[in-house]
């Protein structure tokens, strides 16, 4: 193919139709299209652009509705779809966060004082559930909890005994002694 020629794309429709073309370099004449392009679908969705951009191309695209550039995301119905999708995602994230907040509210009091990550919250909840299961399995039905267990403490939504290891110590982090915050090694 010769690099010195330039093709012109012309839609040979009615005078009110759209013309698209490439400007030929000075001193060269553009080659006419061998067949009309009226059967080729060409959709234009105007977007936003700077005035210098579309002023430079007003002669090339005389029937294109400028101002505007051609953008991929400028379809007429896409913004509503994106807004609905984003709203659904916001609602989902809000619901998940509320679930974690409720779960934190059911953990013993010492754990609710610190803002826990989602992973820390789940790990602490797992350990607390295991602790409660061990407590229930060690206690016969109808018998009071053993004397070594601390009295029930108010922890938000539940009135479950708080393990003594959750009480804050004066040295170090108040949560360093909590068995519910220790890292859990995955068992294979």
Swiss-Prot record:
The gene is Ascl5. Residues 80-93 are annotated as: Basic motif. Residues 142-153 have a biased composition (Pro residues). Residues 80-132 form the bHLH domain. It comes from Mus musculus. The lineage of its organism: Eukaryota, Metazoa, Chordata, Craniata, Vertebrata. This is Achaete-scute homolog 5. Expressed in teeth (at protein level). Residues 169-181 have a biased composition (Low complexity). It is found in: Nucleus.
């Amino acid at each position: 193919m010769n690099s010195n020629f330039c093709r012109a794309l012309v839609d040979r429709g009615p005078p009110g139709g759209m013309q698209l073309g490439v400007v030929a370099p000075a001193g060269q004449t553009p080659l006419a299209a061998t067949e009309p392009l009226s059967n080729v679908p060409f959709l234009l969705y105007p977007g936003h652009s700077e005035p210098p951009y579309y002023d430079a191309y007003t002669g090339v695209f005389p029937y294109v509705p400028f101002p505007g550039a051609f953008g991929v995301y400028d379809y007429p119905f896409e913004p509503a779809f994106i807004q609905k999708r984003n709203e659904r995602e916001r609602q989902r994230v809000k619901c998940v966060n509320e679930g974690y907040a409720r779960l934190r509210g059911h953990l013993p009091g010492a754990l609710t004082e610190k803002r826990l990550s989602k992973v820390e919250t789940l790990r602490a909840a797992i350990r607390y559930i295991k602790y409660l299961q061990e407590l229930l399995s060690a206690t016969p039905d109808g018998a009071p909890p053993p004397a070594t267990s601390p009295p029930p403490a108010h922890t938000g939504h539940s009135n479950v005994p708080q393990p003594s290891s959750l009480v804050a110590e004066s040295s170090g982090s108040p949560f360093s002694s909590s068995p519910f915050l220790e890292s859990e090694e995955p068992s294979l």
